[in-house]
């Protein structure tokens, strides 16, 4: 299969590309190299919204915490303020995560900064909602960043990553067609990593996966989601691995992984959860229990 390496804007999207080695010895570059290596048995760990069990989600403190525990990828969410500032926020409103109220798109950045972030239990803290720029300054050279809910802001995100010199350590995912992604990436001389999301038991997901397979495209990785493990799911995963791509799975909640989720691992035997995901071929796992997952993987020699 032709290798789709979008990290350094290898275009056209559907053509063959040459892998580029990381230019420095920093930790983020080493993680990027791991993502580019389908033969590696190490499992890349992504932390969902950072260490939100101990700090407000998508906060600088939550980012620093997961960097400290050895997480490989920080997943964060983006929204655009009324005055066009990209901030870290999952919801359309700031009601749940801050002391304020209202839709992000209706509020200026200065107004949002006057609010404080809340913990997952709704307790107010002294932390403030960071901008994308602030978050990337913290992450630079230290951890790969998965910008979730970010494809619609692609040009704005890329402008920030290029200015900060971190484009090569940013991953964006989506459900767009190969042609749509190719057209977007053709607009820029350099691009971020891109990974398709495949809801394999849904018609749209089946169609997107079939499109990649029929065109002979092997992206760096596929994110595969399923609510029940079936022969179709197994076949999809086997094709991903055989085709030379990484397999990203989510252990966040049961409907994304057929019940092999973080709560099951925390309340039971991690080997019966994370172990099964690894045995299915997963080499990238997004989790809400990064410490538990890393501990298990290290016990099997699958994480540094």
Residue map of PLM features:
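Phosphate-group recognition and catalysis centered on beta-loop-alpha active-site segments
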Residues: 17-304
